[in-house]
Amino acid sequence: ACVAFQAEGRQEVIRLKMPSEGTLVIPDLVRGEVTFAWADEQDHVIRRADGSCLYHLATVVDDHAFRISHVIRAEEHLSNTPRQLFIADALGYPRPEFAHLPFVAEPGSKNKLSKRKLQKYLKDPEFARLQAEGEWIAERMHRATDVETFNPVLVDFYQQIGFLPDAVLNYLLLLGWSLDDSTELFTREAMMEAFTLERVNKAPASFDPAKLQSFQEKWFQKLEEKKKVALCVPFLQQAGFAASPPDCNLAPRLNEILRAAGDRVKIAGDILRFEEFFVSDEALDYEEKPFAKRIHSLEVIDRLRRLSEQFQKVDCFDAAHCEATVRNFV
């Protein structure tokens, strides 16, 4: 057969002759001992007909060349491990330690999160709400919001609307690992000090948009006022509400708005929800006649009179008490 193939001009490939009997036990730092039967392994091609090497040979040689001691990767690569260890043994390389991590699962499911299932995820109320909030911010910055390239499955989504890297990292850390039953917030330094592979969960954890937003809110509120201002300025600039470079009055005004807004600004992009404070009165455009008709109606006048009476009862006339008065009235 080989002679006939050569006569046809075919180029040979090189296959790895695998054992056909026995088992291989892999000590995995996350999953414990994992057993594979050699009979389930094929004789894999390790060099193509054009002379190039395939992934399994290349990655083993590459890891050895760079003195890799630990191979930490997603669980779908677990099935690749037997052939890679067989290659390492054949080449006389020391075996690295392996740790196969669980994937991030869909909301309310144990299936792997995938950008190809967006329409399914958008039926989840929290996922849909996060998508809508992101689109609202992106549209005001004149950015494309095509759901295939702008959605909560992609890291760029969070970067574009103002999520903090530390908040996203903190959330991802606790998706598959925990220190104890109470500690939630970790700085990067604390993560590096506390993290061990032994406490990584074997099972995948579902992506929870509400929990991620909760981490973002906590991290944003921890920031100094100066840092919050610095994060919000680019969003105002891209939306056309601030000059580039910004004028000297922007930072003090923005600081006051952030103080008054309190926890209503959870991500930097939320500052665009207060866009009316960055538009001059002359730039406001509205139809005067319909507005005058509505504002002079007896119902509106009565409401304003009753609201005025509530304000007269306020002892401390500051932003917090005024807001509480209006909210209670409404």
Segments from the language model and where they lie:
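Generic recognition of stable, solvent-exposed alpha-helical segments in well-folded globular domains
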Residues: 79-83, 99, 149-153, 163-170, ...
